[in-house]
Amino acid sequence: MPSKFSSKYVDTEAISNDDDNPFATAKSYYSKDTDLSTRVSAGRPRTLSTSMEASAAPTIPELKNLRRRGSLDEHKQPRKFLVDVDKTLNALLESEDTDRNMQITIEDTGPKVVSLGSASSGGYRLYELRGTYQLSNLLQELTLAKDYGRRYILLDERRLNENPVNRLSRLIKGTFWDALTRRIDASVLDVICRDTKDRSGSHVNRIYVPKAEQEMYEYYVRAAKERPYLNLQVEYLPEEITPEWVRDVNDKPGLLALAMEKYQDDEGNTHLRGVPFVVPGGRFNELYGWDSYFESLGLLVDDRVDLAKGMVENFIFEITYYGKILNANRTYYLLRSQPPFLTDMALRVYERIKNEEGSLDFLHRAFSATIKEYHTVWTATPRLDPKTGLSRYRPGGLGIPPETEASHFEHLLRPYMEKYHMTLEEFTHAYNYQQIHEPALDEYFVHDRAVRESGHDTTYRLEKVCADLATVDLNSLLYKYETDISHVILEYFDDKFVLPNGTIETSAIWDRRARARRAAMEKYLWSEADSMWYDYNTKLETKSTYESATAFWALWAGVATPRQAAKFVDVSLPKFEVAGGIVAGTKRSLGKVGLDNPSRQWDYPNGWSPQQILAWYGLIRYGYEEETRRLVYRWLYTITKSFVDFNGIVVEKYDLTRPVDPHRVEAEYGNQGVNIKGVAREGFGWVNASYEVGLTFCNSHMRRALGACTTPDVFFAGIKEESLPAFENLSIHKN
């Protein structure tokens, strides 16, 4: 490490901030108000120090024979360090980041010790920081301080050795949610219009607005004129959106408008602004379907009701004008939805705002939109299977999905390219415009689009069969729609729910629909012999044998009888439970992985937040508290372990069988959140949510064990003789 240096003369007593919050957000902690370079005192010299070896300290003759390990002295008050940001950051990376990836992890082979000068000694007395966790936290703090333009900082020791459970939860609540928040209006159009999936080669930004939203259209036209550098085109959507129109507009793709609200500025003028929403990860700018539901669960835990409500409002807007909750709000997604969760989402938000003015109107609008989507999307052709009465993921569309990489389907298409003596571009155009007819290829893309609508892209469970499957996940969700709608009509609208077109809905009809779906699911999806819920192939009229964690959704929705739940927990739960939580599918169902059978991200051994959360709520709904806590601890341990050992990362999914590095997932899409530089800035939406939701299931014993990174097996062995208190204050909708 470099030796100590003299820099500014800083009066450390004058800037002492013992009363300041050491766990404030980075934006607050590294604000200009705490900038040491603005607090210079000419009267008394002090020194700032970078991290350094103790032997490099200046020699004082009178003390040269005294050797004290000041860094190991006991102390009652938390220390504060005076730090030169750039020099300490560079020295830290040089010494500790041995693989040069801008992270400090357990895989780096540096000494794992640095020394910092204390503020109370003016940077003279050095104290050691040891271990991966403290050093990676130091790297994160220095990176953030540099982001905020800080040259020198007064860094509280408590910020470096903070309990990792508290630190991660604090970051999610105070930093990650804000970093993932977007809105669509003039203030952010230059960022929000960017589309990493746009293959058209055009440099034109486009936004498409519903025909009925004239004020919104004029707003964006005005914004385009005021900001010519945006190169923004504002287009009206046609009244009727057809597969042909969606195909044709792939040559000029664009963003789809979302809800806006009116507000008054300080001068009393009225303006429009976008209703905010949360995106799945840092590289996204769109409102996604089922990601938003799980994010809302975490947002509500963290009292970010405004964002959860905003996403419901945006979904109402989408159903009103685009006919469905979209995969995401881009033109190429106009025919594709995602797993529907709107009733539960709206009810949870309503519970938090029910005493506010307009809350009942909010609930009415949300459920009116849900009923429209239910009838026109999920129980209509082509998604409804008339014989079973069950529904399938089966979106419309023509040609090859345009949002994929240009080469994504090249291996599949090459035989056809050779057959017709065409290049990839030539064949793609001819096929998309039905100049070439290949029934086998048509069927492939019907299933491919269905897999994408399911949200489970990709998995061997759904590959080449998805559009024919009445899946347990979709039908559990629709059962939940039916029971929620029945409950809301009866409890909140006196059993008379008037739709915008004047139609009156009663609870009885929705109750009958729910009972009919439950009977059909028991007949076609439930296996008494296997104690398992399976998908049903409506074309072959046979049950699938793939064991998927979506079976837990039947418990979450309340489809299962108590007897079925008991059999499922006794026989099937052990097939999914591994060291890190619930795997997406069982090892038996995956089969042998090889060159011709590569790993898929929604298969064993990977685990995803949606499957964990729905399993927790499903199990606790039927009274399985011990099993719920066990699964919660496993999943939170997986996230916490990666966070502690790998520089604070929070990733999209985890390999639940890897005890050391579960964030490393070997699958076709990689893993978002792995390649951070210095600090994780937003985590991943539904993983953030799963952590916050999971902590609501934890008692103090579990939190302490997680903070100490106690492995699940050790923790469970320690509590085998001990009874844990019952769950309290869990929000579980059992309608």
Swiss-Prot record:
One Pfam family hit: Trehalase
Active-site feature positions: 457, 652
One GO cellular component term noted in the UniProt record for this chain: alpha,alpha-trehalose-phosphate synthase complex (UDP-forming)
Outcome following mutation: residue 100 to L: Decreases calcium binding. Decreases activation and increases cellular trehalose level during osmotic stress and thermal stress. Does not affect binding to tps1
Pathway(s) the chain acts in: Carbohydrate degradation
Inducing stimuli: Induced by thermal stress and osmotic stress. Induced by oxidative stress.
Cofactor dependence: Ca(2+)
Coiled-coil region(s): none
Mutant lacking the gene: phenotype: Increases cellular trehalase level during osmotic stress and thermal stress. Resistant to heat shock and osmotic stress. Delays spore germination.
Signal peptide: none
Enzyme class: hydrolase
Record-listed Ca(2+) binding positions: 97, 99, 101, 103, 108
PANTHER family from the UniProt entry: CYTOSOLIC NEUTRAL TREHALASE-RELATED, TREHALASE
Family stated for the protein in its record: Belongs to the glycosyl hydrolase 37 family.
Protein name (record): Cytosolic neutral trehalase
Organism classification: Eukaryota, Fungi, Dikarya, Ascomycota, Taphrinomycotina
